[in-house]
Structure formats: C-alpha cells, structure tokens
A protein has these predicted regions:
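Short, positively charged and aromatic/hydrophobic N-terminal segments
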Residues: 24, 45-46
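Helix-loop-strand module that forms the ligand-binding subsite of alpha/beta enzymes
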Residues: 101, 105-178
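Glycine-rich phosphate/pyrophosphate-binding loop and the adjoining helix
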Residues: 182-239
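Cofactor-binding loop segments of dinucleotide-utilizing enzymes, especially the Rossmann-like FAD-
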Residues: 57-59, 88, 156-157
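Residue-level recognition of beta-strand->loop/alpha-helix junctions
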Residues: 56, 87, 185-187
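N-terminal beta-loop-helix "entrance" segment that forms/cooperates
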Residues: 85-104, 194-198
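Low-acidity, Ser/Thr- and Arg-rich intrinsically disordered low-complexity segments
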Residues: 2-10, 17-30, 34-37
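N-terminal beta1-alpha1 ligand-phosphate binding loop
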Residues: 50-79
C-alpha cells in the first residue's frame, strides 16, 4: 500500500462518502421512506481479493497526473487487498524503446495486470494525445491484455482543450487491448491540481467531487462481483 496521502485527502474522502450515499438514494428511491436511517457511509464493505494495478505514464517526477492517481488510490485503499503502482519511467528504457516483450520487467508488468481486477491508467496529455511513454508500455501488452478488467482512465493537461484526448485518444487504445468496462474518466487541468510545498497535491472542489463520484460508483459495482453474491440490503444502503 502507498503511504497515506495525509490531510489533503481528507476532503476527498468526505466527498467520496457523500457521493456514495447520494448514489444509493438515487438508485433505490422507492424502497425506503424519506426519514429512514441508514448505516454510516464509512461502513463500506472491504472488497476481498480485489487487486488493483495503477499504470503511471508521466515521464516527470513529481507530476500532477501522479497527484491525481494518488488521490484515487487513497479512496480505493480501504476496499482493495492490494494496490500496485507501476511507474513506466522506472521500467528499463531499452526494453520499452526496442519493444522487448521478453524482458523480465515487462513480463512482470503483464503478470500483475493479468492478476488485477481494476486497472487505473494515469497520464499527462501532450499535443492532444496521452504520453509516448505510456504508449511504449501499452504496445508491449498482448492484444487482449485488458480483457475482463475494469479500467479507470485519469489524465491531466495544460488546458480544457485537451479534454477530448481522454475519449478519442486513450479510451480507443484501451478498448483495442480488450477492455470492455471502461469507467468514466477524470481529466484535470494544471489549474485544478495545486502542487503543495511538501510535494503533495490538492485537487479543486470540482475535480475532487468528480473523482469521488466515479470511484464510488466503481466500488459499488465491483464489490458485489468480488463477493460473488448480492450484498445484503443493509450493506447496499451503506454504499
């Protein structure tokens, strides 16, 4: 597990809990009276056996895409048994540049993705496309390398003009790798992610709320799948 993000993530977690509660109220409005009392949102079930792999495609350190990924991880950590972050910049450059499929480090990445239930892909957007560093790794995955996995795309860029790169550049490649369950992505501009003096990052309110909503929906959807059965009503309402 990664180190605790700290106080900067506390607001994200609170927004996450509010979004989870609101999502359940919208989904089952007729089954409970308005004044019914429900379990606290903090009672979310731990998703036993859910492995998560994060692919960070930023060539820079530190980076805002890493900060966005860190916040997503902090929301998911209570609901996963393992989260691994693969920083593509730390993989052997020669293996990436020369497309060495048999390199041990690349083979290890493929194995970790194969064991994952959820794959998070985080990248900066350069010239209306995801990073070339990320592309060099995706090219070394098998054609069905993301089949059967839920994928959450995250991206950062200099301006709102790059927002469409998430939909028209990154998501089609993920689909070409077999991903059929691609969550709504989160895109944030540099102005929406503040870099703090201690190296952490703080999201603005809109980005924080969107990330909390999307991650909350993922937890709600994946928890019953991993448990192998529908959650009891009291736990479903805790979501």
């Amino acid at each position: 597990m990664s180190a605790t993000i700290g106080s900067a993530a506390s607001g994200v977690n609170e927004a996450f809990r509010r979004c989870l509660s609101a999502a359940r109220l919208r989904r089952f409005p007729s089954k409970h009276p308005r004044n019914a009392s429900f379990p606290a949102a903090g009672a979310l079930p731990i998703v036993q056996g859910m492995n998560i792999v994060c692919l960070l495609g930023s060539p820079s350190e530190p980076s805002r895409s890493a900060g966005l990924l860190d916040h997503a991880r902090s929301l998911l950590e209570p609901h996963a048994t393992r989260i691994d972050t693969i920083r593509v910049r730390d993989l052997p450059a020669e293996a990436l540049l020369h497309a060495r499929f048999d390199d041990p480090a690349i083979a290890a990445v493929r194995k970790r993705i194969h064991r994952a239930r959820l794959v998070i892909v985080a990248t900066p957007i350069y010239k209306a496309a995801y990073s070339g560093l990320l592309k060099s790794l995706l090219d070394l995955l098998p054609q069905d390398g993301l089949a059967g996995r839920t994928v959450l795309p995250l991206a950062t860029g200099g301006s709102p003009a790059h927002l469409l790169a998430l939909e028209y550049a990154l998501k089609p490649v993920l689909a070409a790798l077999g991903a059929r369950d691609i969550a709504d992505g989160v895109y944030a501009t540099d102005r929406q992610i503040e870099r703090l003096p201690d190296g952490r990052h703080r999201l603005d309110e809109a980005t924080e709320a969107r990330l909390a909503r999307i991650v909350g929906e993922l937890v709600e959807r994946l928890a019953p799948q991993r448990a192998g059965a529908r959650l009891p009503a009291e736990l479903r309402w805790a979501l």
